[in-house]
Amino acid sequence: MSQPNQIHNALYLAFQRLQWSGLRESVPLTLSENDLADLRGINEKISLSEVTDIYLPLSRLLNLNVGAKQQRGLALNEFLGHVPPKRPYIISIAGSVAVGKSTTARILQALLSHWPEHPKVDLITTDGFLYPLSELKRRGLLQRKGFPESYDMKALVEFISAIKAGEPNVSAPIYSHITYDRIQDEQQWIRQPDILIIEGLNVLQTGQDSPVDTQRPFVSDFVDFSIYVDANESLLKKWYIDRFLQFRTGAFSSENSYFHHYSKLGDEEATATASNIWDTINGPNLTLNILPTRERAHLILQKGPDHMMDQVLLRK
């Protein structure tokens, strides 16, 4: 994460934590400590004060944006003289591995669902659209999992296009972090929510990032509001290693885990393994594919140590 520069100054309004928290106004805190415990990710220490200072103002901003979109829809309906299918407001959340995208998405889902104007809020991750493990092996992409070419982008765009068109029932594949693969014969059904949150590494990509296929639509073409969760790479690497060490004694210990062999590593060897995975896969993916999309986001959440937000950048 670079410090605010000329591009940031030209494109974004910058808010320090105290400034941003003041934009909450009278939005009530609807989550308890028990609720938050269920939403936290591995190795994250997000507190209720973080929800109050950062996420409540953000939920207010999103509620205002959803309301404005709904009003524009009503005006268009009146002009056209008919009522089109219900189309969800789509929010995307991008950022590096280990930055806390999933926790951000779950907290926003919980908060936004308490607004009476849009009580039905669904959440999906793009992980389900990774090619199956067998296909990744066939294509020689196993060591590039998470890179843009490891996703079935055609299926992902068809999914979000159907959502945006107001299709009543749209299915998405489900991914297992235990087996490191899609779950066979299981799907997540999206049935015309008021809001759909889509979380993934590459959801801000455009044709500029795919020179061999610039004309096809991208996920970002269908998104109403985009968020990028940002942090310095040294923090990201540390969080990834810390998470890996926790998985080693947790999820990896299951015999069904694709990474079960890592559970037998000692601390030093596990740390070295995680560091190597970061340096050869996650770090390069961040540098080449994820970080260059940051300035396309409508809002950037910048994290400091302990996953605490220290600045919010809102596009002008």
From Swiss-Prot:
It catalyses: (R)-pantothenate + ATP = (R)-4'-phosphopantothenate + ADP + H(+). The keyword Coiled coil does not apply. The keyword Nucleotide-binding applies. GO terms for biological process: coenzyme A biosynthetic process. GO terms for cellular component: cytoplasm. Keywords: ATP-binding, Coenzyme A biosynthesis, Cytoplasm, Kinase, Nucleotide-binding, Transferase. SUPFAM superfamilies: P-loop containing nucleoside triphosphate hydrolases. Its EC number is 2.7.1.33. It is found in: Cytoplasm. ATP binds at residues 95-102. It is an enzyme of class 2 (transferase). GO terms for molecular function: ATP binding; pantothenate kinase activity. CDD domains: PanK. It holds the Pfam family PRK. Pathway: Cofactor biosynthesis; coenzyme A biosynthesis; CoA from (R)-pantothenate: step 1/5. Belongs to the prokaryotic pantothenate kinase family. This is Pantothenate kinase. It comes from Shewanella pealeana (strain ATCC 700345 / ANG-SQ1). The gene is coaA.
